[in-house]
Regions:
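AMP-binding/adenylate-forming
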Residues: 43-57, 70-136
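Short beta-strand->loop
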Residues: 73-77, 159-160, 248-249
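Conserved AMP-binding/adenylate-forming
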Residues: 163, 169-282
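Secondary-structure boundary elements
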Residues: 60-67, 93-96, 121-125, 144-152, ...
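Nucleotide 5′-phosphate-binding alpha/beta core
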Residues: 1-69, 73, 118, 122, ...
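AMP-binding adenylation
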Residues: 111, 142-147, 158, 232-240, ...
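Short, aromatic/basic amphipathic alpha-helical patches
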Residues: 84-94, 142-145, 167-176, 364-370
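Adenylate-forming
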Residues: 107-114, 124-170, 174, 183-192
Length: 421
């Protein structure tokens, strides 16, 4: 089942438990990253389920039983799921004997910085939660405003999209201070279910080793964008057609073998650990004892454009830019699309936003375009063949824009793929 043949085919009441919305306590909506937003009924019971899954993360990785914690929820509030979900689940975790104070400034840089400045000194640590591009912006904005992140015991809980290891390294350098594996944690979720899986020190260490290893441990492991561990008792995955993920979960709408539109795979803990000898150098002191199955993601199958019949994936472009020597001069936001020229040829276009204080220049535009052209050929042999076949017409057309030009709507994921004009 999927959104088209199940969710959109029937009324909201028909697909809800017992054919009614009476068991629901509130509504959340999807971000609309792949289509029109949709409303999802949720209950307090499902928030408690999420709380149970997040509790080991808080207590074992963030040590919240012993460490007083200021949790700053900078996910979008309102009807969008993440803000309320993490607010409710974290309050439940606090009620289980964890010294956590929860604040919810939402997607507001100034308010987020104001609350962290006001309360961080009263707690042993700060956990800042939000969408990766927004949190990166908060960190940069805070540094400019004089916030000494390096003097603060701050951890980041990020959700909404996977993060690459170069991106993690870049953000750790912006934060300064300890470079611990548990300092930046990415979580995976969907509007349909809320929270699904999270990174652990073990999954992060394995992901970093995989990127540097020639060992063939997972199918297409060079494409892995997210590497998590999950709780199969409450989030059960199956893989069909090689890399299509099906999820069964207790949500506001019953989901049975639901097609997530994410591609990837699952791996048994014991099977992965048997391969550990191939992955030398895992820091045993940090990985802990996370005996849970692994979930790896290549990305959403629909976050791409078709260029001369080739699929050009957002994830590959993000990875290329994050590995560039000029990444600090970029905000991290871009859009991609394929346009038709006056000669009816296709043209691959990127609009890339610069970081605060940077101005577009012809020289910089040329550098970015050449770098992307080179990196995309490294990523895709098909694109390399296309470059040979059509020459300069395969070269990306890059437009650099000042900071703030690419706007994001609060609560909605950034639309990496723009519509053609």
């Amino acid at each position: 089942m999927d959104k088209e043949n199940y969710i959109a085919k029937y009324s909201l009441e028909e697909v809800s438990w017992d054919g009614s919305l009476r068991s629901a306590n509130y509504l959340s909506s999807s971000s609309g990253s792949t289509g029109s937003p949709f409303f999802w009924p949720r209950s307090a019971r499902q928030d408690v389920i999420v709380g149970h899954m997040l509790q080991p993360l808080f207590e074992r990785m963030f040590d919240t039983k012993k460490t007083t914690t200021f949790f700053c929820d900078s996910f979008a509030l309102g009807t969008w799921i993440a803000g309320l979900l993490y607010y409710n689940a974290t309050k439940w975790i606090a009620d289980q004997g964890n010294a956590i104070l929860v604040a919810s400034p939402g997607i507001d840089k100034e308010e987020t910085i104001r609350e962290i400045r006001r309360f961080s000194s009263s707690f042993d640590q700060v956990i800042l939660a939000g969408y990766p591009p927004f949190i990166k912006d908060v960190i940069s904005f805070g540094k400019e405003a004089g916030v000494k992140w390096e003097d603060m015991n701050i951890r980041l809980l990020l959700g909404g999209e996977s993060i690459s290891e170069p991106w993690r390294k870049n953000l750790l350098s912006l934060l300064g201070g300890p470079q611990s594996l548990a300092r930046i944690i990415s979580v995976y979720g969907m509007a349909e279910t809320g929270f699904i899986a999270h990174e652990t020190p073990l999954s992060i260490a394995l992901k970093q080793e995989l990127s540097a290893s020639s060992a063939d441990i997972f199918p297409q492991q060079e494409k892995i964008a997210g590497f998590y561990q999950y709780y199969p008792a409450t989030r059960y995955f199956e893989v069909v057609e090689e890399d299509s993920l099906l999820l069964t979960a207790d949500a506001g709408i019953p989901l049975i073998r639901y097609y997530t539109r994410d591609s990837g795979g699952i791996a048994d803990y014991a099977a992965v650990m048997r391969q550990k000898k191939t992955l030398a150098g895992l820091p045993a002191a940090e990985v802990g004892n996370w005996q849970m199955p692994f979930l790896y993601l290549y990305g959403r199958k629909d976050l791409s454009v078709s260029f001369y019949a080739l699929k050009m994936y957002v994830g590959n472009v993000k990875s290329a830019l994050e590995q560039s020597p000029f990444y600090s001069q970029l905000s991290g936001l871009f859009t991609m699309r394929v346009e038709q020229t006056a000669n009816f040829d296709q043209r691959l276009e990127f609009t890339i936003e610069l970081s605060r204080g940077q101005e577009p220049s012809e020289h910089m535009t040329h550098i970015v375009a050449e770098f992307l052209h080179h990196k995309l050929q490294e990523t895709s042999s098909e694109y390399t063949k296309l470059c040979t076949a059509i020459g300069e017409r395969a070269t990306p057309h890059v437009t650099l824009v000042p900071y703030g030009t690419i706007t994001t709507v609060p609560g909605k994921k950034h639309k990496w793929v723009a519509a053609s004009t």
